[in-house]
Amino acid sequence: AARGLQVNDLSPPVQPSGHASVPLFRDYLAVVRKAGRHRFEWMLRRCDNGLDVPAEVTVSAIELDAEPAMLATIRDLTERKVYEEKIHKLAFYDALTDLPNRRLFFDRLSQALAHSERSGQYGAVIYLDLDNFKPLNDQYGHLAGDLLLQEVGRRLAHCIREQDTVARLGGDEFVVLLVHVADNLESATDLARQVAERILHDLARPYVMSLDEQGNAARKIEHLCSASLGMTLFPPCESDSETILRRADRAMYQAKGEGRNKICLAEVD
């Protein structure tokens, strides 16, 4: 079915690596001519339906009728890629909310610290804990709690920019990472506080959940669940992720101790 077709007929214009397909394939063929064989991953585009298919391609230099030729064998990697994506998601994302987990949060915080050191800009971490979560679980069970946590994740995601991160650390604890906020402490503090206030406002709105119990008609419940927020800025010279998170955590507990449903700012050392 592919007889007479060129690589640009069988590939998207750009590979997942970001390289243009045609010149990249030429580079691979040059390797084959030199080494005799080359194996690589390639995104193919099906001729019949235009869908892209991940594949492993092995190209070997051969002789055909006493003339040099190349033989390509192709293995479909779709199932393997789906499996790898599942493993990646289990490793880096919270199963309940689909938010980044603690491990991915620390990866992104480390990247943010490196960027902050290069750019001279401040970042911020907002640590939050829900104020009235346990009574919901006690009264209505874990299904209601799970539904509320999922909604908390959605509300938090709407409060931040695309380049920022919301992660679930576990239980009813979440953390927000704001990157390259501003190049001076005063402006960065003001901007980060605006985000924290938006979070405080959005999480304080009533939660309405539908519980479907044992096949019966769904029962709607309404619950109020504010949050206590601890916020800290990290300057360009800081490099300890654990210290930053502990500082935000202490500020969060200070907010709890001062009556809940508020923001406390940890001073930058």
Language-model regions, residue ranges each:
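Sensory beta-strand/linker motifs that couple input domains to effectors
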Residues: T73, I126
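Short loop/turn elements at sensory-signaling interfaces that couple input to output
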Residues: V57-M70, P236-D240
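Terminal output helix/cap of sensory domains in signal transduction proteins
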Residues: G4-M43, R193
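Conserved long alpha-helical elements within nucleotide-processing catalytic cores of c-di-GMP signaling
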Residues: H88-F92, D98-A124, D131-R161, A167-G171, ...
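PAS/PAC sensory module
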Residues: H38-M43, N49-T58, L71, S228
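Cyclic nucleotide signaling catalytic output domains
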Residues: V166, E213-E222, S228-E258, C264-D269
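PAS-associated C-terminal cap
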Residues: R75-H88
